């Protein structure tokens, strides 16, 4: 009888549930947005909190640089000053819709939706 009880206890312990002791991994992604001559491409991006947008900036056809200026919205990332070349990342941590413009080129704008 003792052997049966011990075997039952060992079997029950082996069938126990997972304690969830594994560390969850982050699955944040990065999305590239390109500042073309007079447009952002893509000009609409939908991401999750913690994701990164990499703004790829190159000179416009006339040699002018670009800026990325976000509307004054709570949670918006820092603006990007006028630059000629570079890949400038911005991490979006807050949920919401974040509209941005290039003031060097009127009409050049985009939106990031974080949900």
Give the label of every model feature segment:
Residues 15-115:
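Extracytoplasmic copper-binding redox domains, predominantly the cupredoxin/blue-copper superfamily
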Residues 1-14:
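Sec-dependent bacterial lipoprotein signal peptides
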